[in-house]
Structure formats: structure tokens, C-alpha cells
Swiss-Prot record:
Quaternary structure, from the entry: Homodimer.
Native organism taxonomy: Bacteria, Pseudomonadati, Pseudomonadota, Alphaproteobacteria, Rhodobacterales
Similarity-based family: Belongs to the peptidase M20A family. DapE subfamily.
Cofactor: binding details: Binds 2 Zn(2+) or Co(2+) ions per subunit.
Pathway listed: Amino-acid biosynthesis; L-lysine biosynthesis via DAP pathway; LL-2,6-diaminopimelate from (S)-tetrahydrodipicolinate (succinylase route): step 3/3
Record keyword ATP-binding present: no
Positions that bind Zn(2+) 2: 103, 137, 354
Binding site for Zn(2+) 1: 70, 103, 165
Name of the molecule in the record: Succinyl-diaminopimelate desuccinylase
Amino acid sequence: MPAVDPVRLTADLVRCASVTPADEGALDILHDVLSDAGFDCAWADRGGIRNLFARWGRKGHPKTFGFNGHTDVVPIGNADDWSMPPFGAEVKDGIMYGRGTTDMKSGVAAFAAAAVDFVRDTPPDGAIVLAITGDEEGDATDGTTALLAYMAAQGEQMSACLVGEPTCPDRMGEMIKIGRRGSMTAWITFIGKQGHAAYPHRACNPLPALMRLMDRLASHKLDEGTEFFDPSTLAIVTVDTGNPATNVIPASCSGTVNIRFNDAHSGASLTEWIKTELSRIEGEFGVQIDLRIKISGESFLTPPGPLSALVSKAVKAQTGIEPVLSTTGGTSDARFVKDHCPVVEFGLVGQSMHQVDEHVKTDHIVELKAIYSRILTDYFA
């Protein structure tokens, strides 16, 4: 069996218009590549989402290296804004264009290619697992969590896991993610009493309460940062009255805030802080306030240790760059994997992800396969 070309495999995956929750054949392509190489493959579908589990080697082996990734992508927006077909995987001047070229079909292709070649040429004393989902860019309720549930039910496990998200800001090899901030969103509705703007004493205007609360939340310094995390941030993301009239005091208004928090906080502690602030505002302004909270993920950290050292060594050997260990950025499915085993993330340069004309250097895909190959070689040495 010839070596798997990660560039060709990336192109095959990109040509599948797998906008969440659609798969459009992407995971079937991966299934065939892995099963042909001797991987035991199974489907862990849930809620209409396709998820692929693949393992080479003995089930439950104490030395099992795992990889987690996704083949679903975000919408393309207006296709007319693209200079290349968004699902064409066309290459120009050494650059492949298309949705998912960076985030993260190239990462999935690079690891699959590395794993297939590795078990063919140097079968390890151990096992390799790939857990690939079609639900990362959406609600992520039936993706990696479904795969982990399937693994638990089947007695499958991973000793360590690498997530192939694009982690490098500008240069290939410059950053490994060893944790992520938590994320939560608060939707807050203020209910007053509608009235004529000329007679404010006959109404109860909820807007001053909204403005006061938003000012209190946004001006509060949550923390100074911790050893491995930057300071937590709070962003006001929506404010709405639904009131186009200039002579009417609105009956209600609403605002939304998003908090990205480090390990000085939890979703529960921040929820209590917001509730305390709401109580003060209710007492001061006499309005009714409704609160809805969604915690998308808690902060987590895989402390520097054997796994981050393993990946750092491979990255430096291939690129000559000593990668920074970071916890910056948004959420990823590593937030689910961290409850199963130690997890870090490493992948391509992510500058164009989710953008029009998303693209990747084909040389970087080849280099990423080489890095992943080094990781496997060193892990099973």
C-alpha cells in the first residue's frame, strides 16, 4: 500500500460540502482509508450526526494514542464573495482554497495519513484511536460527547489524546494549546411598564436598569490572570429594545453578555456573581429581571508534562521552532476529551479559518503529517 498523500486526502474531504450537520460523504472517505489500512471502524451516530470511531491495535491497550478532530465546517456565506469555489479544493501557487482547508479537514487528513503509514511500516506495541465527529462547529451536543459515550460503552479508551485544531497564529509550529478558557453566555431581560415618553412617571423604563447593569458588569475586573491563563474577559454582545418609536418608553429590553473565563472561576461562581448584580439592580430600579445562562464549557488545563513535551519535541524537530504552550483562543472539543485523558492541541496556522477564501499552504499539510508521524514514533518508542 503506497503512502497516503495528505494533500490529496484533504482535497477529497474539502470537496464534501459538510456544513454542520451535513456530512456529504466526508466521513465515508475517511472510513474507507482507515478500514483499508486495517483499522477497526465503527459509527457512533447520535441525533442525526455522523461520528466515526477507528482503532488500530488491541481494544483497551494501556498504551493507546488518540486523535480527535472534526470534518464538519461552518457555512460559506455568499459564494460570490469567494475567488475560488468554496468546495473546489483548487490549488493555486501552492495554496489550496476551500471551506475546511484550515479548520480542520487538513488536520484530520494529516493525522490519518500519518497513522496509516505508521502502522504499515512500524506496527507499534499499542493502539491508535481516531475519534472524528461531524458536530463540532454546531451545538456540539452529538459529536465528540457521543464518541466518548460510545467508547465508554464499548470498553474503548485513550491514554493520551491530540486534537488537531489549527493552533498556530502566524507561523507553523509556534503554538500548542494545553488548555482552554471556559465560555458562558447570559441572556438578560428587563421588564418594566410601557408609557408615553412625555409622562415617564406613569411608566417604568427598563432601559436605565439595563444600562446600569451592563456598565457594572463590563467595568468589573474579573481577575488579573493566572499562571497559565490570560485575564478573563466579559463582552457585551447584544442590546435590544424592540422599540422603533421615539415617543414610547419600552415595556422591556434585553442584553446579552459573553464571558471567557480562566481557572480562577467556574461557570457556577460567575452565575452567582451575575445574580448578585441583578438583585441590586432590581432593588434600585424596581424592574423585573429574567436571566438565562448557558455554560458552553469550563476552563481546563493539562499541566505541562509528558504529553506536551512529546508534542513540543516533534514540532521543534520538524520546524526548528520551540512552540509556546498556550491556553488562548475559543473553545474546542478538547473540553470534552479532558475528562477522559490528558489532551493537548496542535495543528496548522489558523489565520483564514471561517473566512471567505479559507486556504492552506499544501507544504504545511505535508509538514503537519511529518510532525504527527514524529509524535507517533516517539510515543511508541
